[in-house]
Amino acid sequence: METRTLEDWRALLEAEKTLDSGVYNKHDLLIVRGQGARVWDAEGNEYIDCVGGYGVANLGHGNPEVVEAVKRQAETLMAMPQTLPTPMRGEFYRTLTAILPPELNRVFPVNSGTEANEAALKFARAHTGRKKFVAAMRGFSGRTMGSLSVTWEPKYREPFLPLVEPVEFIPYNDVEALKRAVDEETAAVILEPVQGEGGVRPATPEFLRAAREITQEKGALLILDEIQTGMGRTGKRFAFEHFGIVPDILTLAKALGGGVPLGVAVMREEVARSMPKGGHGTTFGGNPLAMAAGVAAIRYLERTRLWERAAELGPWFMEKLRAIPSPKIREVRGMGLMVGLELKEKAAPYIARLEKEHRVLALQAGPTVIRFLPPLVIEKEDLERVVEAVRAVLA
């Protein structure tokens, strides 16, 4: 293994900052290694990771079973288009659909969450022959042109208008607004069971159940975006299980590949059959390397039942945060280990202090919300340290 000096690391950090497109606000550190719920920077500092790759690292950084599966597959076959079947693709399809409701039995594999949502929107139009989409205020579905069209935040959308139209945005958890919006021109309603970027806001059972009923009544599809909520994050395998409904299309990504880029749109058979041959495509989607990672990730999740850990630790963590006696806290909310701490002021300075003073990595979810997405393998003692760090920066 190549040995690098601290000067080498600093040069690489500078290279990333100077040669990057500039789209991202970069932290002033270089992460070089991760294991479980911990990561280390080039100077050897250890951090508790509550960013988790924006929800990618549910199974922990460097999960040994995923690593071994990727190594083994890389030695055999890494790339093959979907027109040429491979054993690992069939294995992945079989493994994934086995843990889903029987209605969701057709898989379109891609590389990311935004691609999964792009596919879902196209399948919805192909199936219904309609154009309109209904989405939620504060909802986030991606930044490519189709998924951006059903993403609420104006700062993301407005510079790139015109986008896919028509799209009608409704207040999240407003059943009456949903009833008014969904009509005979609606192809699909797309919703997150818990809004992530929008401030970690869980749906009410009444809202999601109404979405299922209304779409069925109007002949529209229900797309559930579980890019961030899937793979055990909310205390169930998939968040829709909390609500007793099954969507027409389910989109997954982030943790699905155990750290390897992998996304899917999983749908009902009749929806899949509506897409004409060649109506959608992807070069890398379904590649054997990602398929092997996905199989290993699902099998690890199933064997360890990490969603039960999220169901246990998440409420405990939220109660500990609520017990912090700070007038700066407005609300603590979430589902499982998807947790938002809303402040009465801007969150960014406190997130920076968590990193610099306490070696805790967290992220924003809107201007005033600190979001915690730790790997589901995190130890309770680490979460206790996170609580104490939050207590200290809010003092």
From Swiss-Prot:
Its EC number is 2.6.1.118. Substrate binds at R143, T282. One of its GO terms (molecular function) is identical protein binding. It catalyses: [amino-group carrier protein]-C-terminal-gamma-(L-lysyl)-L-glutamate + 2-oxoglutarate = [amino-group carrier protein]-C-terminal-N-(1-carboxy-5-oxopentan-1-yl)-L-glutamine + L-glutamate. Pyridoxal 5'-phosphate binds at G113, T114, F140, D225, E226, I227, Q228, T283. Binds 1 pyridoxal phosphate per subunit. It is found in: Cytoplasm. Its cofactor is pyridoxal 5'-phosphate. Belongs to the class-III pyridoxal-phosphate-dependent aminotransferase family. LysJ subfamily. Homodimer. This is [LysW]-aminoadipate semialdehyde transaminase. The lineage of its organism: Bacteria, Thermotogati, Deinococcota, Deinococci, Thermales.
